[in-house]
Amino acid sequence: MQVKETVADGLKREFQVNVPAADIDAKIDEKLADLKDKVRLNGFRPGKVPTAHLKRVYGRSVAAETIDKLVRDTNDGIFSERGFRLATEPKITMPQDQKEIEDILEGKSDLTYTVAIEVVPAIELADFKSFSVEKPVVDVADSDVDEAIKRIADANRAYADKAEGAKAETGDRVTVSFKGTIDGVAFDGGTGEDIPVVIGSASFIPGFEDQLVGIAVGETRTIKVTFPANYASETLAGKPAEFETTATKLEAPQETTIDDEFAKTLGLESLDKLKEAAKARLGAEYAGASRLKVKRQLLDRLDEAHKFDAPPSLIEQEFEVMWRSINAEMQSTGKTFADENTTEDAAKEEYRKIADRRVRLGLVLSEIGEKNKIQVTDDEVSRAVIERARQMPGREKEVWDFYRSNPEALAQLRAPIYEDKVVDFILELANVTEKKVTREELYKDEDDKTAA
């Protein structure tokens, strides 16, 4: 067998491989000899079928199967001998001429093919002990706990009927029945009976709640609204609609006394226990936000310390995934590049940079995990599946069965677990210092991004 490297351009490699007909024939004979003791043919005793007869009956299929395995094994040998880690699947170009193919299958001609690959570059890892990371820490203040409990109280507020003839005000709960039309035609999902609406809660289409102000029980109004451009239903998105709406009940919010009795309505023993639960929940939220900031800093350090040319095909794949998502979002919201103060070309350039960073960081994290034998256990994946199932009450078995029968979805759960374990490994080595910050400072970056 002869192997000739024909392309060595950056991370791209191409080889021309020649496999002698004699080698192919020998492999085919080995396969036929193995079949000899397994096949059953009329007129022959088990194990006594002549090889020549087997070749006539199974020759072409055995030859095709043998060549396929021979090519795969040969390629694996080429890559392992040179220490290549493949970025993508090899691109194999086999002979196309029909006569040449026939000659190869019949053992009359050598097999010559080409295999093109893109390799992962060698990565020299940084000294993680030189990394410095600042961990923001927020103490849960009593005022934070009080605010959290007030939000809970507001969400569980009681309502009482307003006096006969009273008009609806912001904050009131109005029970309505409505029939919606677009251009005079009813549409799916446009009808509702006895639906409670809290005016000012922003839980309905923009403009709907505002037009309920001043309505009385028994009164019917035509409410005119326009569905948002990013509305979930594409058939309704951006369209004007009218709802013939009748108020059937009107209630005013009642003051909620935050005491032991209120805590008991939530299943807790006392107000002190409610405060403890609220404080623990806030602490977990702050810890999660702090973790995200630490991780972002660490990824920035990894990015700065590992500059290399990533495989172009992986960058292109990552870019295509992001770009499809961007286009889908723009179509659903109706936004344009001009709305974002940019152009399509400028946006593409920016997202290609992001794709490059993501690919490089992915390769670096993979290298760290591999060199330090970091693995994700089956128990860790199972816990992730259970957590996902808990998020969908009543559909737990459906979620469990989905992941059991869908390896790709399971891999998507495994990936972030692996990444977090690698991050934890680096943090054990890095110099991490804590810094006391306020709640506002902790969430500042996220608020700025939302505003942008």
Swiss-Prot record:
UniProt entry keywords in alphabetical sequence: Cell cycle, Cell division, Chaperone, Cytoplasm, Isomerase, Rotamase
Catalytic activity: [protein]-peptidylproline (omega=180) = [protein]-peptidylproline (omega=0)
Subcellular location: Cytoplasm
InterPro entries tied to this protein: PPIase_dom_sf, PPIase_FKBP_dom, Trig_fac, Trigger_fac_C, Trigger_fac_C_sf, Trigger_fac_ribosome-bd_bac, Trigger_fac_ribosome-bd_sf, Trigger_fact/SurA_dom_sf
GO CC field: cytoplasm
GO biological process terms on file: 'de novo' cotranslational protein folding; cell division; chaperone-mediated protein folding; protein transport; protein unfolding
Principal location listed in the UniProt entry: cytoplasm
GO MF, any single term: peptidyl-prolyl cis-trans isomerase activity
Pfam families: FKBP_C, Trigger_C, Trigger_N
Residue stretches making up the PPIase FKBP-type domain: 171-256
EC number: 5.2.1.8
Function, as annotated: Involved in protein export. Acts as a chaperone by maintaining the newly synthesized protein in an open conformation. Functions as a peptidyl-prolyl cis-trans isomerase.
Family in the record: Belongs to the FKBP-type PPIase family. Tig subfamily.
Free-text note regarding domains: Consists of 3 domains; the N-terminus binds the ribosome, the middle domain has PPIase activity, while the C-terminus has intrinsic chaperone activity on its own.
Official protein name in the record: Trigger factor
Organism encoding this protein: Rhodopseudomonas palustris (strain TIE-1)
Taxonomic lineage from the root: Bacteria, Pseudomonadati, Pseudomonadota, Alphaproteobacteria, Hyphomicrobiales
